Curated annotation (Swiss-Prot):
Matching InterPro entries: DNA_mismatch_repair_MutS (IPR005748), DNA_mismatch_repair_MutS-lik_N (IPR007695), DNA_mismatch_repair_MutS/MSH (IPR017261), DNA_mismatch_repair_MutS_C (IPR000432), DNA_mismatch_repair_MutS_clamp (IPR007861), DNA_mismatch_repair_MutS_core (IPR007696), DNA_mismatch_repair_MutS_N (IPR016151), DNA_mismatch_repair_MutS_sf (IPR036187)
Keywords: ATP-binding, DNA damage, DNA repair, DNA-binding, Nucleotide-binding
Encoding gene, per UniProt annotation: mutS
TM spans (from-to): none
Job description of the protein: This protein is involved in the repair of mismatches in DNA. It is possible that it carries out the mismatch recognition step. This protein has a weak ATPase activity.
Protein name: DNA mismatch repair protein MutS
Organism this protein belongs to: Clostridioides difficile (strain 630)
Keyword ATP-binding belongs to the record: yes
Sequence similarity: Belongs to the DNA mismatch repair MutS family.
Disulfide pairings: none
Cited NCBIfam families: mutS1, PRK05399.1
Binding positions (ATP): 620-627
SUPFAM superfamilies per UniProt: DNA repair protein MutS, domain I, DNA repair protein MutS, domain II, DNA repair protein MutS, domain III, P-loop containing nucleoside triphosphate hydrolases
Amino acid sequence: MQIDMNKLTPMMKQYLEVKNRYKDCILFFRLGDFYEMFFEDALVASKALEIALTGKACGLEERAPMCGVPFHSANSYISKLVENGYKVAIGEQMEDPSTAKGIVRREVIRVITPGTVLDGNLLENKKNNYLLSLYKDGTNIGLTYVDISTGETNATCLNEDKVIEEIAKIHPTEIIINDLDFIEKLRDIATVSNIYINESFSDNYLDINILKEYFPDVYLQKLKFDDKGLIKSSLSILLNYIYNTQKQITSNINNINIYNSSEYMVLDMFTRTNLELTQTIRGNKKKGSLLHVLDKTSTAMGGRLLRKYVEEPLINKSKIENRLDVIEEIKDDFILREDLNDILKNIYDIERICGKIAFERVTPKELIHLKNSIEKLPNLKDTINLSNAKILKEYVSEMDKLDDIYNLIDEAILEEPTITIKDGNIIKSDFSDELKELREISKNGAFLVKEIENREREKTGVKSLKIGFNKVFGYYIEITKANFKQAKLDETYIRKQTLSNAERYITPELKEIEEKILHAEEKIKSLEYEIFVEIRDTIYKNIDRIQKVAKTIANIDVFVSLATVAHINNYVKPAINENNKLDIRNGRHPVVENIVGEENFVPNDTYLNRGENIINIITGPNMSGKSTYMRQTAIIALMAHIGSFVPAESADIPILDRIFTRVGASDDLSQGQSTFMVEMNEVSLILKNATERSLVILDEIGRGTSTYDGISLAWSIVEYIQKNIRCKTLFATHYHELTDLEEEFKEVKNYSIAVKEDGEGIIFLRKIIPQGADKSYGIYVAKLAKLPDEVIERAKYILKDLEKNHVYNSVAINGDKENNNIINSNLDEELVKVNQSNFKNKYESLKIEHELIVKDYKHIKKDYDKLNSKFKALNDEVALMKQNDDKEKINQEDSVKEVALTQISFDSVNRDILSEEILNLDILNMTPLDAINSLYNLQRKAKEIKS
């Protein structure tokens, strides 16, 4: 939009001069009691904020588009713009309009971006707001991130292929990077995680001289920067950007934590999402996540630190055990736990108060909050020292009580100060002799005004006469029109204003008193502001001391929270090992249990160990609880690594370097990727990065493609993990063929979810049992989902037809030479009938089918042997029961329980008949088709007896 600057009014010209320096921002331009926006900014903001778009005369032929928001409520509008990815520049009046000569001087005092928000109303109390910078040099990257509201600063260097995982862990709200080409690789995670990527990089951000403005040379020399200067460069980008937006150097950024990402368990973006660590998959809400269950923190500082614990599981055994020991001390001491909770709930957000002090935006009320928090420190320290918590005592042994800071605020600031620092009523009179004297004058002035009011009432004869005040012409005498005619007014009364029902006057005496009073009140406000700034600056110089105390409080709060959760939910202290054995007894899913209650949750064991079983194949119908079981195993392992007690009867957890999850299905339509492609990409990531020390959760791999492709891929993936990676793996599948892997590899074991058939329906028992499932129960599940009866009945008919006629489902092979000849003969006959043009494709298809049939026989033969063994045992039981028929009756309840696990049921009256028929079967001399038909008939008879 081309604008002729020469035609603009002076004010509008000033606006555009400021706007041109902040072209990528929406400029909030202060005009009196409003922030106004003009031209393109007005068009954008009015739409985003849903406010009226008007116009203003600007010197051009057309009025300038304009919209505005009230100064006193601007924060809510700024918040909405920032949340929608806009940057907001605050153009403030730098002088008093009443004393300004000409146009009021205006300047941008700060730029608000997603990563530089300071206002508490725009921030989540228990979540950090990180600004992250990246400096890329080749494939190496320096990464630094800071929460400017607390001053927390962390830095590391890593390879570019690790950056996405690190960003997923940190979850910044804004990223700034020197390599604009690399931005494209960040688009996906930025979209998924709602991260603002700042593309307005300036080479000035690389000026490392900024480091000396924040840190002494001695401190910088002690820091372990990388040899290539990656961290120095990324830190310089960050600090220069902060200075450019906030227009000042801040003292709360005074300590850098340089860390190595290998110190923590690696969790990729998919795993964090699938396990719902800090927010749910649906709705992105904290409620329903692991963090929601664990968070009983009393302070905002503790809440933020707990989130960091969950996001960054430790892999150092001694550090994990130290946390566990502290939590155990608190959990086992009910009185200590309750006392600490009572103290902590009265402590304010000290970290963010420090941030506001550093940016000169702290209010008097917030300093009172700081004082009240410091007041709790002696009690906190004494409570811990009087307990038996030996390790916890170490945390507070050298904790600064900040007595000097407390005394300063207590002596100076009123308990109930005004909200704004320039309106007075902030400082106690006894803190300053000058202030005390001025307040006496002000107080007496009010008395003098009252005296004048009483005297003028007598003089004029108007009893309702009153003296008021406004900012336009100060003190005035008001007489209502009803009393005007009887009023005896002399020449000292000077009319100033006529209202509909009253007249207002001033007198020389009133003006003389006014000057004394107003001078005193203005001086009081000015002096109070000066004193407040001095107090703020004194505290500012001690921010590092206060921040250390805040960090100690946050740690104690997290320990108390985890101890409280462990006590309430009956969690146990896990053992931590380095021998790669995972052994969970009666484990529970913490989130699901929190919803349904411990008494309604069915616990399950998980055992994974080298030499015995490193891969568990889990079969069972949909909705039976496979995914919940696998997720709970991963979550219990992760909880142990953050130093938390876990929901189990006992748990022995190995140090894991990574947890991978491939759970659920979703299309990535924005990238043109199908469910199956997304699945394969995630599996590829796992196979490339998993190690022997990893835990892998795979759910229904291969379901996004054809049956044969799916089985082949799933089989091959399990083989690859077993032979090449050898990591602990839970592999859920509906391909029952994969249970044959147990025979191929001794470290692969079959498990399934127990199901009880109940007439036409099924009951999910939610219990993991050591055997593969023999049915998928798909139609049963469809019935539970309330599909139309017509659909269900038709599905049953089709299923029976498929089971009867399809080679793959109907033929069982012994695997010996004779039966292989039968299959080969059948295949030859089939091939003769095939059209010559389709010969090759048909042959390959039948060849694959033949191989699957051979494999399937082993599964069927194994199940038959088990079945036959159970039949024989059952026959013996029937004989025994007949002998003791007069002594006892069959316990029908026990019989039903047996049905749930074996899925075999016989009426006690007819058991001997059916058993005799089973014993007379000569299964090994039957053809495969005869064998399967005989088994089918026996199953049918058993069902008839049951019904």
